[in-house]
């Protein structure tokens, strides 16, 4: 709570309640999502307050969300356990227990990131159908757009691991692709590949030049 007083002559000008003393971003007034968030922080259960703190910037470590929530340590831990056991919070990575440094994401946050990953990869496969996948660095850069802060390398890698386990995508050493995506040639491309392979077999020690591969009958 806070009170604004005039020192001389002594007079109380007003006062109020600070709902979120450490906001991670600016919120636009009068928007339904802003009002709903403030109502949760003001009157919600500890689990609702904890999940609201998580949603500011996720995924995050359990310790970080505890600190954001403003709840007492024991109350924050109980709130997290309630959210986790109820399926509203998901552990990432290899963590199976809610340790302080475990990364966690809300069910709603995961749905949003999963949909964004799928959309980015689908768009990439449409634009570059002959590529096996999207470079990890490029995918992270796209995923960071619009976020309050970039994903840490650990958070990004653990999100990819969770997404792969959920059947959303597949990860190789350097690239990421949608689950089930394979490079497929058009009939014209397949015919060209067949001609080039035949040319290599006919002249294994003097393979065709790049120009001859592009123009089989000569430039």
Q: Predicted regions span which residues?
A:
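C-terminal effector modules of nucleic-acid-centric enzymes and ribosome-associated factors
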Residues: 1-219
């Amino acid at each position: 709570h806070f009170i604004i007083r005039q020192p001389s002559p002594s007079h109380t000008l007003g006062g109020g309640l600070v709902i979120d003393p450490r906001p991670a971003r600016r919120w636009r007034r009068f928007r339904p999502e802003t009002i709903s968030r403030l109502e949760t922080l003001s009157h919600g259960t500890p689990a609702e307050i904890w999940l609201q703190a998580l949603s500011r910037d996720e995924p995050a470590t359990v310790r970080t969300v505890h600190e954001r929530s403003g709840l007492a340590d024991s109350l924050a831990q109980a709130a997290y356990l309630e959210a986790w056991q109820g399926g509203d919070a998901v552990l990432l990575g290899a963590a199976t227990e809610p340790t302080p440094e475990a990364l966690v994401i809300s069910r709603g946050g995961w749905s949003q990131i999963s949909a964004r990953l799928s959309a980015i990869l689908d768009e990439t496969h449409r634009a570059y159908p002959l590529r096996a996948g999207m470079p990890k660095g490029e995918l992270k850069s796209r995923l960071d757009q619009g976020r309050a802060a970039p994903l840490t390398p650990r958070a990004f890698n653990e999100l990819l691991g969770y997404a792969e386990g959920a059947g959303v995508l597949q990860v190789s050493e350097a690239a990421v692709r949608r689950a089930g995506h394979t490079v497929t040639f058009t009939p014209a491309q397949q015919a060209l590949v067949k001609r080039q392979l035949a040319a290599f077999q006919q002249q294994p020690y003097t393979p065709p030049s790049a120009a001859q591969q592009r123009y089989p009958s000569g430039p």
